[in-house]
């Protein structure tokens, strides 16, 4: 089964940045990535895809934040790990994300080496 990663972020450059950093993996079919530019769009994608392997979500988005989205994702897909990716790396935000069910927490600017290790670990667990 192919690893499917959903990236949720309202910033317009996120998709191109992720596709650039993971271009070899994507070309090799190691995993697939889809992108949602809002929490409601992500929730729709979670409903449509029967088995996302990993969700990476920004926290600060207009309308519905990643923290507001997190319990809804966990209710629909309790076994899918969600890693929060945010510019707000303070302890209160980290604690709130963990309490809501986040499997991990990364701060922006994104350390793509660290993110790759997170993805590799998740892929090993599901293999």
What does each model-identified segment do?
Residues 61:
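Receiver (REC) domain active-site loop signature in two-component systems and cognate sites
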Residues 38-41, 65-68:
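Acidic catalytic/metal-coordinating carboxylates
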Residues 12-34:
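Two-component/phosphorelay signaling modules centered on CheY-like receiver
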Residues 68, 89-104, 117:
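Alpha4 helix (beta4-alpha4-beta5 surface) of REC/receiver domains from two-component response regulators
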Residues 111, 120:
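Receiver (REC) domain switch/active-site region of two-component response regulators
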Residues 108:
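A Lys-centered signature of the CheY-like receiver
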Residues 50-56:
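Active-site beta3 strand of CheY-like receiver
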């Amino acid at each position: 089964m192919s690893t499917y990663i959903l990236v949720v972020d309202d910033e317009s450059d996120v998709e191109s940045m992720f596709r650039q950093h993971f271009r070899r993996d994507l070309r090799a079919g190691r995993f697939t990535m889809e992108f949602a530019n809002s929490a409601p769009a992500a929730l729709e994608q979670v409903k449509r895809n029967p088995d996302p392997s990993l969700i990476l979500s920004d926290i600060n988005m207009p309308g519905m934040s990643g923290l507001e989205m997190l319990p809804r994702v966990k209710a629909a897909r309790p076994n899918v790990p969600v890693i929060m990716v945010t510019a707000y790396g303070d302890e209160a935000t980290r604690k709130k994300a963990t309490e809501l069910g986040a499997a991990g927490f990364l701060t922006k600017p994104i350390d793509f080496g660290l993110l790759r290790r997170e993805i590799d670990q998740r892929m090993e667990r599901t293999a």
